[in-house]
Amino acid sequence: MPIRTFIFDFDGTILDTESQDFVVVDEMWKAHDQVLELTEWRTGLGTTGGFNAYDALEARLGRSIDRAHWKAHNHQRLLEHCSTQPIRPGVHALFDYAIAHGITLTVGSSGNREWVHRWLHEHGIFHLFATIVTSNDVSAVKPSPEIFLTVAANVAAHPADCLVFEDSAHGVTAANRAGMRSVAVPIPSLVDAWMPDSALRLRTLADITPAELVARAAAAPLPSATA
């Protein structure tokens, strides 16, 4: 069955904001003479309600920190770091391929609307997407399939015709539960992390041509939806 819709996760897939988040949170922990383990931090990627850097730091210290100060400080630092990040390798080529082949481009993100829209506008790609679904639009984020199923409904696409691009285990799980094929492309800090089964797992989206990627993904077995 041909792929008719691309669904891109945002954080970590289109733009590597997640590595920058670790840098900023790690700075806060070091300021309190604590070590943040990468394996602990990455449990919260691609979802909400997972690892909370503030709760974990306070538990480690056995006391409260000035959260208002640190949240404002960290937000500004994150904006500074993210503003220097390019679109991840291979993403623009997939956009071009989709446009040339009549494939609908969409975004399905567990991030909030303001955050996702900000960076899509910043990089001049907001207009490419037929629909952008964020945490503001659903009752449950990934690993629930609701975000991806909402994307499909918004563009009248069947899940079997969709290909999801994800960097996190929560995102790939959500795609599988939605009955959609997926391409896993972890950020560098997740390359050794466990991932659910996906149609493809790549180091970057530039590892193979868009045509080969689509052909290989389309030939992969379709996950059984469990929504």
What does each of the following model-derived ranges do?
Residues M1-R4, D96, N112-R113, H117-A227:
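Asp-based, Mg2+/Mn2+-dependent phosphohydrolase catalytic module
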Residues P2-A93, I99-H101:
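N-terminal helical cap/lid subdomain that shapes the substrate entry/recognition surface
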Residues D11-G12, H101-T104, H123, I132:
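Surface-exposed, interaction-prone regions with an acidic/low-complexity signature
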Residues T13, S109-G111:
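Conserved phosphate-coupling serine/threonine residues in phosphotransfer and NTP-handling enzymes
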Residues V35, T104, R181:
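Residue-level detector of anion-binding/catalytic polar loops
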Residues C82-P86, S110, A178-G179:
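Short, flexible loop segments at the rims of nucleotide/cofactor-binding pockets, characterized by
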Residues I87, G108, A140:
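Residue-level marker of regulatory loop/turn positions in helix-turn-helix DNA-binding domains and
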